Amino acid sequence: MYKHASSPRRRWIRLLFSTAAISAVAAAPFPASALASDDIVQFSVIPGSLDFGASPGLPGISTLVLNGQAQTISSRVANFEVSDASGTGLGWSISVSGDDGPGKSPVLKQYCPALECGDHAGPGYVADGSTLPANSLTLDSNGATFMPVHGSTGLRPAHQCNAGCFVDAPPLSPTKVVAAASGTGMGTFRTSGFSSSSLRLAAPDSTRRLQTGELYRVDLSWTLNSGP
């Protein structure tokens, strides 16, 4: 039986149809897929310390010229700095008092800074030497403030002696001069704005003269405490 062979034109049409079908399948969009990956960021904390960056230090006071009257002479308190890197947020405070440790005097007392001063041997306090009473030195922080430094942004501590505080207080009754309440004082803060009369010495009319080269001197103890 004679079979009619496919004409070249029919084969070409079938081939063209097959190619178009494959192209259509290849061009059809497939559903998009997304890959998710979980991640975390974490760090630990090592606490630092509560410390003075620059310790408090009262300046020297000019020479007192006796005139038979009670006198007050003044000087400017040097700035100091506190750094709280403890991370507790408990706050802190600074207190000061006279220091009665060995070789020290908690009140202004006659002192020889040289090997000898007249008939007194030195250096050191003169045994049974003249003294001024406790509470002769006043710190006045009126107008002073604390400035954050080194990028600190925490709440500032507060001065406590805007009406004046005695810094040569008895050792058992220290005077609080600065307080940072709970949640404040975190970071580093430096004092600013002490006036030229922020330290005052009250010298009574009974102040005794000293031998050549001698001074009145007092030892003070500044304490930085955790908690306000």
Predicted regions and their residues:
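Long hydrophobic alpha-helices with heptad-repeat/coiled-coil character
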Residues: 8, 23-26, 217, 221
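Generic hydrophobic-segment detector
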Residues: 9-10, 14, 26-27, 133
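N-terminal prepro-regions of secreted/extracellular proteins
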Residues: 10-12, 33-36
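Signature of Gram-negative chaperone-usher
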Residues: 35-228
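C-terminal segment of classical bacterial N-terminal signal peptides
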Residues: 25-34
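Bacterial N-terminal signal peptides that target proteins for export
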Residues: 4-20
